[in-house]
From Swiss-Prot:
It catalyses: tRNA(Pro) + L-proline + ATP = L-prolyl-tRNA(Pro) + AMP + diphosphate. One of its GO terms (molecular function) is transferase activity. InterPro entries: aa-tRNA-synt_IIb, aa-tRNA-synth_II, aa-tRNA-synth_II/BPL/LPL, Anticodon-bd, Anticodon-bd_dom_sf, Pro-tRNA-ligase_IIa, Pro-tRNA-synth_IIa_bac-type, Pro-tRNA-Synthase_IIa_type1. Catalyzes the attachment of proline to tRNA(Pro) in a two-step reaction: proline is first activated by ATP to form Pro-AMP and then transferred to the acceptor end of tRNA(Pro). As ProRS can inadvertently accommodate and process non-cognate amino acids such as alanine and cysteine, to avoid such errors it has two additional distinct editing activities against alanine. One activity is designated as 'pretransfer' editing and involves the tRNA(Pro)-independent hydrolysis of activated Ala-AMP. It is found in: Cytoplasm. This is Proline--tRNA ligase. Transmembrane segments: none annotated. Belongs to the class-II aminoacyl-tRNA synthetase family. ProS type 1 subfamily. Keywords: Aminoacyl-tRNA synthetase, ATP-binding, Cytoplasm, Ligase, Nucleotide-binding, Protein biosynthesis. The gene is proS. Its EC number is 6.1.1.15.
């Protein structure tokens, strides 16, 4: 491609709306342009990268035995109502009606559609196993779209669904997808780690995320420094701390005027946070649920939702609901005599002795409370893991880092096949529900994550595998006929050899061309200048030093970079 023919306009200044490096650089490099909040147009340069990421995904999915197809983006409400998710999915779903007043949505995800296809097309176990995938635009009405294409309302996703006759088949499909994802992210030059995760709105019994460490990531990820344990904070666990056994003391009601917070209580009682158990009330779709954790812990709302069951909306209870359940103002709730639909007690609280809780009376707390003697509830893990706690696998210390999810794999089991009556005839002639798996990659998010990991002060540093062009050819002076001729010859030779070259034939200063090449992240640069009189040109890797080479050596040097990166020329 010749730059004089390209639709591209780079920006020298950082747009005020851009918060993170990938967003800034995609705008500055002319890869995307904003249409509305969370909605972007992909310009030619950006689309080339997007298609290369898609091609890598497609190649590895095909190699893993999956078949590509394309589902409709507009989905009738009936399918979502069958699965029970029409109401459960919430405000993120774009809903619409046709002229006949029938309900539809723009697909935020496609479990129902794939399940519908399977129940209509697959009749016998002989047609299994099957893995179908698509690469398609998804739509989610994010409350706060931000970070460019990292969290947008419209995004490209690869979603795949496996159908098996038994759990063993699902396990095999899941492992194949895991291995395919490792290859995909490696080929994209992305350092992504597989971590244990919660299944969220998708559902299912088992899931893992592929996370990219990032300071601007939306998730906290727990890593063990001594083994391979890694989990999203929503899923992460750590062995509960247990106090040494003590004699139960007599409970003691204490007046604590204007003392509500843990910090205030620590000062009032002259002790530490670990001697308190705080009781927080939630409204879970109309049910009032109380959750108890130790005074220095934070409640994990995902774990709480999972313990309750199917929850559409979990939020802190209102002051009115707190008053009704406890008879007190917020800040004085406790487990003794509380009137709630469910009391969830973190396992650490159940292993504490003679601790302090709210008295369910404004201005009072109770000391020397013990689980079992004074109250009971549903014991479980309802807290967030914190830095430095013990790893649940090896006992080493865990660290916490921010991360961005680029892929997610689920073992769905029969959640959707049973809800939608999707069945096949097995070897015994009996009907059985499909055992399903679900596997997603955020294609546009992967693209942005690559930039987050591969950039410097001058712009993007694309891995060769996904770069929009492999090499830029820059004549220093396009008005110099000999420079223009040799630059064009090099460009033509590289292009005919399957190397994607970008000839900067614009009548611009060399410095402008160099800056644009670096900003766009082209992996290699060839500069054709006055040294051609000696049969020489300049060669530079995007993140390397400039070197002078012979004109006749240029092809072999570039070919060597492809071999070094294990990329085949097409």
């Amino acid at each position: 491609m010749k730059m004089s023919n390209m639709l591209i306009s780079t920006l020298r200044e950082v747009p005020a709306e851009a918060e993170i490096d990938s967003h800034k650089l995609m705008l500055r490099a002319g890869m995307i342009r904003k249409m509305a909040a969370g909605v972007y147009n992909y310009m030619p340069l950006g689309l080339k990268v997007l298609k290369k990421v898609e091609d890598i995904i497609r190649e590895e999915m095909n190699a893993a035995g999956a078949q590509e197809f394309l589902a409709s983006a507009i989905i009738p409400a009936e399918l979502w109502q069958e699965s029970g998710r029409w109401d459960a999915y919430g405000a993120e779903m774009f809903r619409l009606k046709d002229r006949g007043d029938r309900d539809f949505c723009l697909g935020p995800t496609h479990e129902e559609v794939f399940t519908d296809i399977a129940r209509n097309e697959i009749k016998s176990y002989k047609q299994l196993p099957l893995n179908l995938y698509q690469i398609q635009t998804k739509y989610r009405d994010e409350r706060r779209p931000r970070f460019g294409v990292m969290r947008s309302r419209e995004f490209v996703m690869k979603d795949a669904y496996s159908f098996d006759k038994d759990q063993g088949g699902l396990d095999l499909a899941y492992d194949k997808m895991h291995d395919a994802y490792v290859k995909i992210f490696n080929r994209c030059g992305l350092d992504a780690k597989c971590v244990a995760a919660d299944s969220g709105a998708i559902g299912g019994s088992n899931s893992a995320e592929f996370m990219v460490k990032s300071e601007v990531g939306e998730d906290d990820v727990v890593f063990c420094s001594e083994c391979n344990y890694a989990a999203n904070i929503e899923k992460a666990s750590s062995p509960a701390e247990k106090e040494l056994k003590q004699e139960f003391k007599e409970i003691n009601k204490v007046e604590t005027p204007n003392t509500k917070t843990i910090d205030e209580l620590v000062k009032f009682f002259g002790t530490n946070e670990k001697k308190f158990a705080k009781t927080i009330l939630f409204n879970a779709d109309g049910k009032i649920v109380a959750v108890m954790v130790r005074g220095d812990r934070e409640i994990n709302e995902v774990k709480v939702s999972n313990a309750i069951g199917e929850v559409i909306n979990l939020e802190l209870a209102s002051s009115e609901d707190v008053k009704k359940a406890t008879g007190a103002e917020i800040g004085f709730a406790g487990p003794i005599g509380i009137k709630v639909d469910m009391l969830l007690v973190d396992e650490e609280v159940a292993n504490m002795y003679n601790f302090i809780v709210g008295a369910n009376e404004t201005g009072y707390h109770i000391n020397n409370v013990n689980y079992g003697r004074d109250f009971e509830g549903v014991i479980g893990d309802y807290r967030n893991v914190t830095e430095g706690e013990k790893c649940p696998v090896c006992g080493g210390k865990v660290t916490i880092a921010r991360g961005t999810e680029v892929g997610h794999i689920f073992k769905l089991g029969t959640k959707y096949s049973e809800a939608m009556n999707a069945k096949f005839i097995d070897e015994d002639g009996k009907e059985k529900p499909f055992i399903m798996g679900c596997y997603g990659i955020g294609v546009t998010r992967t693209m942005a994550s690559i930039i987050e990991q591969h950039h410097d002060e001058n712009g993007i540093v694309w891995p060769l595998s996904v770069a929009p062009y492999h090499v830029s050819v820059i004549p220093v002076n396009v008005k110099d006929e000999e420079q223009a001729r040799i630059a064009n010859e090099i460009y033509e030779k590289l292009t005919s050899a399957g190397i994607e070259a970008l000839l900067d034939d614009r009548n611009e200063r060399a410095g402008v061309k160099f800056k644009d090449s670096e900003l766009m992240g082209i992996p290699m640069r060839i500069t054709v200048g006055k040294k051609i009189n000696d049969g020489e040109i300049e060669f530079k890797l995007r993140d390397g030093e400039m070197e002078v080479i012979k004109i006749e050596d240029v092809y072999n040097i570039i070919k060597g970079e492809f071999e070094k990166n294990k990329i085949k020329l097409k």
